[in-house]
Amino acid sequence: MVERINGKTILTTPISAEDLKGIKIGDIVYLNGSMTTCRDVAHRRLVEEGRELPVDVRNNAIFHAGPIIRPLENDKFEMVSVGPTTSMRMEKFEYEFVKETGVRVIIGKGGMKENTERACKEFGAIHCVFPAGNAVGDAREVEEIVRAEWRDLGMPETLWNCRVKEFGPLIVSIDAEGNNWFEQQKVEFNKKKDAATEEICKQVGFIK
């Protein structure tokens, strides 16, 4: 479900492909509901080893992150700190990952490329950038850690299935049409760079 509340665009799981149609690159959204941390080794297990994720992320969100967790009593946990890790490390797995899992929202640090663009366009998903630098504050948006799976991987790689409230801000970097904000910005940057370089060369031509 997608709602606009107090000027915020809020995605609440379960999220449909239809919910994402009006969301474009550069938009800022927030997430309510189910989000699972999922990074390098979990992607490898699913894509390379053919192992099914023990957490159902269909129509939900994953977060490329390695959080710090505090164990509590009765097999409960508290999120202490959670910041994004570089999404590009998952790029070679992401098409198959989205295809197999049906995940709708991928959250991480930095941009992604063709595999993720194609997955978002074909299967109706988006990639969002989560601003780094406030990992302790961001942990407060995690209301509960519901489940912890693949604990044999250690704390950073465990699948921490969380319930979140207005998790964000999330900047949409790839939308459900496959448009890529980072790649478009590179084109604009290079146009300006070439013009600026030409002007500088005119002004310092006497150095030759």
What are these regions (language model features)?
Residues 37-169:
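Feature captures the catalytic cores and cofactor-binding loops of soluble hydro-lyases/lyases
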Residues 140-208:
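C-terminal binding/interaction regions
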Residues 16, 36, 68-70, 177-179:
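Short, glycine-/Ser/Thr-/acidic-enriched flexible segments
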Residues 23-24:
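Short, well-ordered loop/turn sites that connect or cap secondary structure elements
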Residues 5-15:
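Short, structured beta-strand/loop micro-motifs enriched in basic residues and often containing a Trp
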